[in-house]
Design a protein with these regions (language model features):
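Short beta->alpha connector loops at strand-helix junctions that form conserved
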Residues: 105-106
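Conserved N-terminal beta1-alpha1 strand-loop-helix module at the mouth
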Residues: 2-96, 101
Length: 107
């Protein structure tokens, strides 16, 4: 499984803006192809996760993130927009799936 360099966070560019590409607009049928296309330009892959409760859409899930991790060494940032009841279990599941950074949308 490809993984980013252990010091990926410390090695982010300091002389330009960081390019964090959202996978929301990727073609789900060709997700691996889209991840490969943007790899030379993306510092981080951004994956929004919505549960249909906290946020109205259903977006991405741990198994899909695990598949992305299998084809990409680009760091993966998970943005959780989910209900409190499942927050801790989702953090664990996305960490196990290969997330390198997890942020929580709080209100």
């Amino acid at each position: 499984m490809p993984k980013p360099h252990p010091d990926w966070f410390l090695n982010l560019p300091k002389d330009r803006l960081i390019a964090e590409f959202s996978m929301w607009s990727a073609d789900l049928v060709r997700l691996a192809d889209d991840a490969e296309k943007i790899a030379p330009y993306a510092d981080i892959l951004h994956i929004d996760v919505a549960d249909g409760h906290f946020a109205p859409a259903l977006l991405f899930f741990p198994d899909l993130v695990a598949r992305i991790r299998q084809v990409s060494a680009t760091p993966i940032h998970i943005h959780l927009m989910i209900a409190d009841e499942v927050l801790l279990s989702q953090i664990d599941q996305f960490a196990e799936a290969g997330a390198d950074l997890i942020s929580i949308h709080c209100e």
